[in-house]
Amino acid sequence: IYHGNRLLPGAKEFVEWLYREEKEFLFLTNSSRYTPKELQKKLEWMGLDVDQSHFYTSALATAAFISTQTPEATAYAVGEHGLQNALYDAGITVNEIHPDYVIIGEADNYCYDHIVKATKFVNDGARLIGTNYDLTGPVEGGIVPACRALMAPIELATGKQAYYVRSW
């Protein structure tokens, strides 16, 4: 529906038609970076009024998946606040004490320390989960490493393959 900070041509008219015709709709994103509220505000800034209930992110899909697999799960999570909030809202405790899962999403602050901790936790038995299978992601002016690129050093160091959650 948008690229960068611009609506795609016809997007506004299409969404207005969906509302006018009382169609049910949901915007899916394989990004774990933002919360539905933030996505709502971004579209509002672009001139499109869409309720936050119409957004489903890979962070929400990951949190839902984990909460069905392991009620009261614990996780070491590397990712932005969209992921952290989704895990919290799903009742998943984020900590660094024998986590059940290591979860990797898009992260601006990704560093060697994250790789070291994630490797230790996976070697100690934590299950390795990626919020999406994207190797790169588009940004204004090019591409950036995405979830699978951030996951690669952990998979290589542990010899374990991550499970990647699909949001669609």
Language model: regions and residue ranges:
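HAD-like aspartate-dependent phosphatase fold
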Residues: I1-W168
